């Protein structure tokens, strides 16, 4: 596996409204564990669409991993131009920082938002251009990742395409591990 697409929930879907929320650290730790394993097995590129939440947290994790594995690259392929234009200023600044550090940035449709079809095109693009999908996703709580996960599963039924998931139970294990370590 050379290229993995990473996605997951938006912050509000998880009840997270600031990047210093303790849940963000747990999600980033889970992403770090999975991505490091994949890098050790030959992963070269992580691709995201740049949406707030899991995808931008994954970008931060890639930057951390690059310290030890500088050949790992991050690409941000936005579904349309200026996706951040209606975001709050602090979210725009955070997003622009991630883009400034990415190894490659492009827009899939090369135009501003016109219709939900652009998200469908984004999902298809990500599944076509990657060897696997990593999603912070639990079928018990479908949310925004549902559509790309369905697209990935369809491809997996006809081709050698893998979907990897970080489930809420894994995040709960990390929380308990942190509590255990802090109690010692």
Swiss-Prot record:
Transmembrane segments: none annotated. It holds the Pfam family YpsA. It comes from the Bacteria. InterPro entries: YspA. Belongs to the UPF0398 family. PANTHER family: UPF0398 PROTEIN SPR0331 (PTHR38440:SF1), UPF0398 PROTEIN YPSA (PTHR38440). This is UPF0398 protein BCG9842_B3730.
């Amino acid at each position: 596996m050379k290229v993995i697409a990473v996605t997951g929930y938006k912050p509000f879907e998880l009840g997270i409204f600031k990047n210093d929320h303790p849940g963000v650290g747990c999600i980033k730790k889970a992403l770090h564990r999975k991505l490091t394993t994949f890098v050790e097995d030959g992963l070269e590129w992580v691709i995201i669409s740049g949406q707030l939440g899991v995808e931008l947290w994954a970008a931060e994790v890639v930057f951390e991993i690059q310290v030890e594995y500088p050949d790992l690259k991050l690409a941000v392929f936005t579904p349309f131009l200026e996706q951040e234009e209606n975001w709050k200023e602090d979210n725009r600044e955070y997003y622009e920082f991630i883009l400034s550090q990415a190894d490659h940035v492009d827009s899939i449709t090369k135009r501003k938002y016109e219709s939900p079809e652009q998200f469908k095109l984004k999902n298809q693009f990500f599944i076509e251009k990657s060897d696997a999908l990593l999603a912070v996703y639990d079928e018990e709580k479908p949310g925004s990742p549902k559509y790309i996960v369905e697209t990935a599963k369809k491809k997996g039924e006809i081709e050698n395409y893998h979907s990897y998931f970080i489930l809420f139970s894994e995040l709960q294990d990390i929380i308990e591990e942190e509590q255990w370590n802090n109690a010692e």
